[in-house]
């Protein structure tokens, strides 16, 4: 079976920037375990100096003391860490009419994603080229594969990318074969002479003599 590249519909707005959360220096710390603070008391100070738009709320000035500050920062830390760990998580759904895979690819730009089918398998590839920051080098690679259900036409596979960074790949399920209508075939009755033919009639006459 030949390989086919599946184009996906880009549902993001034109102003969307896939690296908008990557620009601040501290916004890349979740990509490396050694960039995280070790103790809860350090979280408050670390988050207070972090430039993470959309991830962490500013710590209220009224909060005093390391324990109170850590308690205020912990929910924000959990949200950010949960978002990081959710990257690459997929969900497969199959109904009588449709087969669908949803994959979180929020860390990849549209031009870094490729969807193709080959030998009844959907292959999704996402790759970041190696980038350097103050902590070292960062690179990502995503290569999940999904086997299409039997009977699914690979040429009908389509994909789309949502504004939230969810890649959806889907295909219609094959329709079950329609059962043919029952047909009764009539049996035609033939006389004995017709069944035996002319030669049979002559044999009977010879026997009578």
Swiss-Prot record:
- Residues annotated as region Interaction with TGFB1I1? 74-209
User: PTM Phosphothreonine: at which residues?
Assistant: 178
Keywords (A to Z) from UniProt:
Acetylation, Chaperone, Cytoplasm, Cytoskeleton, Methylation, Nucleus, Phosphoprotein, Stress response
Naturally occurring in which organism (per UniProt)? Canis lupus familiaris
Q: Which gene encodes it?
A: HSPB1
PANTHER family on file: HEAT SHOCK PROTEIN BETA-1, HEAT SHOCK PROTEIN HSP-12.2-RELATED
Tell me the ranges covered by the sHSP domain, including all copies: 80-188
Q: Which residues carry this modification: Phosphoserine?
A: 13, 15, 27, 82, 86-87, 90, 102, 180, 203
Function, please? Small heat shock protein which functions as a molecular chaperone probably maintaining denatured proteins in a folding-competent state. Plays a role in stress resistance and actin organization. Through its molecular chaperone activity may regulate numerous biological processes including the phosphorylation and the axonal transport of neurofilament proteins.
Name of protein:
Heat shock protein beta-1
Q: Residues where N6-acetyllysine occurs?
A: 127
Question: Matching Pfam families, A to Z?
Answer: HSP20
Q: Which family does it belong to?
A: Belongs to the small heat shock protein (HSP20) family.
Q: Which residues carry this modification: Omega-N-methylarginine?
A: 12
Query: Which taxonomic lineage does the organism of this UniProt entry have?
Result: Eukaryota, Metazoa, Chordata, Craniata, Vertebrata
């Amino acid at each position: 079976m030949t390989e086919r590249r599946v184009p996906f519909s880009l549902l993001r707005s034109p102003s969307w920037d896939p690296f908008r959360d990557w620009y601040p220096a501290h916004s890349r710390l979740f990509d490396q375990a050694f960039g995280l603070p070790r103790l809860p008391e350090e979280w408050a100070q670390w988050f207070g100096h972090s430039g993470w738009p959309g991830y962490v709320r500013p710590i209220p000035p009224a909060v005093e003391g390391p324990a109170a500050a850590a308690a205020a920062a912990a929910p924000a830390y959990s949200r950010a860490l949960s978002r990081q760990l959710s990257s690459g998580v997929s969900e497969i759904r199959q109904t009588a009419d449709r087969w669908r895979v949803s994959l979180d690819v929020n860390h990849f730009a549209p031009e870094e994603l490729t969807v193709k089918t080959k030998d009844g398998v959907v292959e999704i590839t996402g790759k970041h080229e190696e980038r350097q920051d103050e902590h070292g080098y960062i690179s990502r690679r995503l290569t999940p594969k999904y086997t299409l259900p039997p009977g699914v036409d690979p040429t009908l596979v389509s994909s789309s990318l949502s504004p939230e960074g969810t890649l959806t790949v889907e295909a219609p399920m094959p329709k079950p074969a329609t059962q043919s209508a029952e047909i009764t075939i009539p049996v035609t009755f033939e006389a004995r002479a017709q069944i035996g033919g002319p030669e049979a009639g002559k044999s009977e006459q010879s026997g009578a003599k």
